[in-house]
């Protein structure tokens, strides 16, 4: 998978975009990250609230939830704010639930105690892969937030059990490729989003044949690409948190 002429960006089929993770991007939230997957840029914040949803009252455990949104001009043409329309789109609800599920997969909510960690992922520029960038950045923001809780003595230990990151893969021009940008995503035959832990466990796989159905062989190739890409993202998360 070394053919770079296949992809509009000139990347190899197995090559991520340039990924940057900038911590402490804003000053108020307990965790605040700017994550960049090429030209896709997302601000991810983690905020701690000393309360839990009603269904968790008196159970002593915590909760983690996520919200996702896009600025009106994050894409090629301006879109109205969802608040102005009075409701969230189905896509927005799907993505924020995915982010929440992905992060809860690596959290011991009992260790978090009776508090809620709110993750807010705001896309300031979109060029494909906003949900996968959000998950990858939100983990780092959440890690910073719980580190502060431990340092302040509000919890005895970190509730984080592993790393988690996400990446898109797809079949573009008949070839499995890693980390689709907008040009590839809008023209691919297959689009798949994969969420995995640092230990290599699958948290979620979302795959759709946009054009021709994909074979089991292609699916295996896509998952291999995703696993390698997520391994690199976890390395970048570790490096950011150790900086």
UniProtKB/Swiss-Prot annotation:
One of its GO terms (biological process) is tRNA processing. Its EC number is 2.7.7.56. CDD domains: RNase_PH_bact (cd11362). It catalyses: tRNA(n+1) + phosphate = tRNA(n) + a ribonucleoside 5'-diphosphate. It holds the Pfam family RNase_PH_C. The keyword S-adenosyl-L-methionine does not apply. It comes from the Bacteria. It is an enzyme of class 2 (transferase). Phosphate binds at residues 91, 129-131. Keywords: Nucleotidyltransferase, RNA-binding, rRNA processing, Transferase, tRNA processing, tRNA-binding. One of its GO terms (molecular function) is 3'-5'-RNA exonuclease activity. Gene3D superfamilies: GHMP Kinase, N-terminal domain. InterPro entries: ExoRNase_PH_dom1, ExoRNase_PH_dom2, ExoRNase_PH_dom2_sf, PNPase/RNase_PH_dom_sf, Ribosomal_Su5_D2-typ_SF, RNase_PH, RNase_PH_bac-type, RNase_PH_CS. Belongs to the RNase PH family. PANTHER family: EXOSOME COMPLEX COMPONENT, EXOSOME COMPLEX COMPONENT RRP41. Phosphorolytic 3'-5' exoribonuclease that plays an important role in tRNA 3'-end maturation. Removes nucleotide residues following the 3'-CCA terminus of tRNAs; can also add nucleotides to the ends of RNA molecules by using nucleoside diphosphates as substrates, but this may not be physiologically important. Probably plays a role in initiation of 16S rRNA degradation (leading to ribosome degradation) during starvation. Homohexameric ring arranged as a trimer of dimers. This is Ribonuclease PH. The gene is rph.
